[in-house]
Amino acid sequence: MYLGEDFKKFLEPQTNRRDFILNWLSARGVKTAVMPIDGHEHICVVFPKESYSPLFKIKTVIAHYDIFPGSPGANDNTSSVFCLMNWAARLYNSGIRHNVRLIFTDGEEIASVRKDSEPAQKSFSAENPVSAQGAFGLANVFKRLNIVDDDVYVFDCVGRGTVPVLSKSFVPLKAASKFRNSFFSIESRIARILRSSCDGKFVSLPVPYSDNAGFLAHGIAAVAVTMLPVDEANEYMFNLVRFPYLEDFVLNRKVPQDVEKSFLEKMIPASWKKFHTRQDNFDSLTEESFVMMEKILQNLAVLKIPC
């Protein structure tokens, strides 16, 4: 269903990814608007006004559409984009009041491109600051317009495996109580959605960064969801218990003095090792991941959160 010729065409090096999304959605009657912010071009789906009810909160759903230079970007992040494009087409003429604001963001991978030739990992560091993300500028606009009470759901790299992974995020103890409560509420909501979509088989794990970091940095509650194969998720959880410092390596690329970096790199899930390489290709994807995502998005569409 998802992994057809359109998907392959989207992966072609010469494809203008922004135009592809606009044209694909337009061909299915879906209206869009391009939002230029800080040199990036984000794409917003313009749902009919009848899609919204003032009685419930807006659910902002995001996936970055840019890819790392030289990588096909099949999982990172064409997988999420294609899932959301299909979802947008289904929602657009559904007639239901879903309260979804859907945005395809640009510039997430720019934070991963270093001046030297070595591809950076998907994690934060001095070389890869959260402020370099395209979504950081978008979150800044949200903050300026006082759009701070939305739920923000980010989908990143959902094309391999059947285990939904909720990115483990940390809220500073000094954070405002309103923000802390908002974050824990959205975390609880997405956990319920993931649990009901996959017979309870979901996990919360440390994950390399995604667009939710830019929103969190602005005090806007946001969660990120990715996917892993069962064997990779189990092995990763086991290694996190055995070697607690693995978490800091995944999130911040920090290596303890008495540990070899190569030792830690071996414990990174195989799916993540494909990021930013030629191995992140069409053949690496699994059809069942997209079936799982369809269930998750359907449950998210019907979720109603009273204002």
Model-predicted segments: where are they?
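Extracytoplasmic/secreted proteins, especially bacterial periplasmic and envelope-associated proteins
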Residues: 16, 20, 24, 86, ...
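His/Asp/Glu-rich mid-to-C-terminal helical/loop segments that flank catalytic regions of hydrolases
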Residues: 232-307
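Glycine/charged-rich beta-loop-alpha catalytic/anionic-binding loops adjacent to active sites
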Residues: 57-69
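Glycine-rich beta-alpha junction loops
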Residues: 156-159, 227-232
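N-terminal capping segment at the start of a domain
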Residues: 1-16, 22, 66, 266-283
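Acidic/histidine-rich catalytic neighborhood of metal-dependent amide-processing enzymes
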Residues: 68-196, 204-208, 212-214
